[in-house]
Regions:
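Hydrophobic/aromatic-enriched cytosolic interaction surfaces used to assemble or bind macromolecules
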Residues: 1-325
Length: 325
């Protein structure tokens, strides 16, 4: 299936109660997933019973990949292609479907409220294009769009819309097509990782990847807020207050819109520095703050065979594993 078909005919299926995030109408079933991140390429394969068959990780040289929704992403084509080839060869991948997990920056996600929303895609897609045309710096004919109606509220309905630039998605798809694989499902890393969030109460996910922060709020099967931003600093230079300032707009929006407080915070991507951020987050939100992966392991949502992925901080791949079944 082409990128255009996948985005335009597919529906962004956010059935959080069953932990499903996918681009396509069909239930995701690819046994192989490849995640491309600024610093590495990782791949994993699962058996028919859902257990981890194997995984591989290859580091990328600094600057080999520059995630962007607008400009070319692959800077060092030889290095990125070699990394993708190596991880796929390690898993004996050939002539099969593959799910692609991409940097959050590549796919723009919006949560919008409508008093009334068309039931047919023929009416909905043009309306969404018109409403969001000023939110993306590329032309409509270059835009891949997918959307999903969420559970209705007392008045109106919330719709999740995802936009991406066709030629950017094609950059990533060509990486696996070049070695005989068939890209189908395409999603961003944090949307895959949200499958690890327990959502019985309003939970905020703050996920750092390089210089990017993705903040999402999930509540009882509904994606209530989402924001992907560039941090003013990263690595050892990132300070708790910097993180809080970028998280605050999403948290404030949720509290104003839903009239309730955040009751749980999960954090990913800070590694050994997590402890520095826990106290400031607890003081701000007055709730439990924990590592996304550690909480998922302790709560039993990550099976024993997938622990190696957790140890490598591959929450995007683990999230895909949960989504596929």
């Amino acid at each position: 299936m082409s990128s255009t078909t996948a985005f335009r005919q597919g529906i962004y299926q956010f059935d959080w109660a069953r932990r499903v995030v996918r681009w396509l109408d069909a239930m995701p079933n690819a046994a192989l997933a490849v995640e491309v991140a600024p610093d590495r390429v990782a791949a994993a394969r699962w058996s028919r019973t859902g257990s981890l068959d194997g995984y591989a990780v290859e580091s990328l040289p600094v600057g080999a990949l520059a995630p962007s929704a607008v400009e070319a992403n692959i800077v060092n084509g030889a290095a990125v292609k070699a990394a993708v080839t190596n991880v796929c060869n390690h898993l004996d991948s050939q002539d099969e479907d593959v799910a692609m997990i991409l940097p959050d920056t590549v796919i723009r996600v919006f949560v919008q409220h409508f008093e009334d929303f068309p039931r047919s895609a023929a009416e909905a897609v043009p309306m969404l294009r018109w409403k969001l045309k000023k939110s993306v710096p590329f032309e409509a004919d270059e835009t891949l769009i997918s959307y999903m109606r969420q559970a209705p509220r007392e008045t109106g309905i919330d719709v999740v819309t995802a936009l991406a630039r066709l030629r950017i998605i094609r950059e990533y798809e060509s990486l696996v097509e070049g070695i005989g694989l068939h890209p189908g499902v395409v999603l961003s890393s944090s949307l895959a990782a949200i499958a690890l969030v327990e959502d019985e109460k309003p939970t905020l996910l703050a996920r750092v990847s390089g210089s990017t922060l993705t903040t999402a709020i999930v509540r009882r099967g509904v994606l209530c807020g989402y924001r992907c931003t560039e941090l003013p600093a990263h690595g050892v230079n990132l300070k708790p207050q910097m993180l809080l300032e970028e998280i605050f707009p999403v948290a404030a929006y949720y509290q104003d819109t839903w009239q309730e407080a955040i009751q749980s915070v999960r954090v990913a991507g800070l590694g050994t520095r997590l402890a520095e951020f826990v106290r400031p987050l607890e003081e701000e939100f007055h709730c439990d703050v924990r590592s996304l992966l550690h909480s998922a392991v302790s709560d039993g949502r990550i099976k024993e065979d997938a622990r190696p992925l957790a140890e490598r901080d591959l929450e995007g791949l683990i999230g895909w594993m949960l989504q596929r079944g």
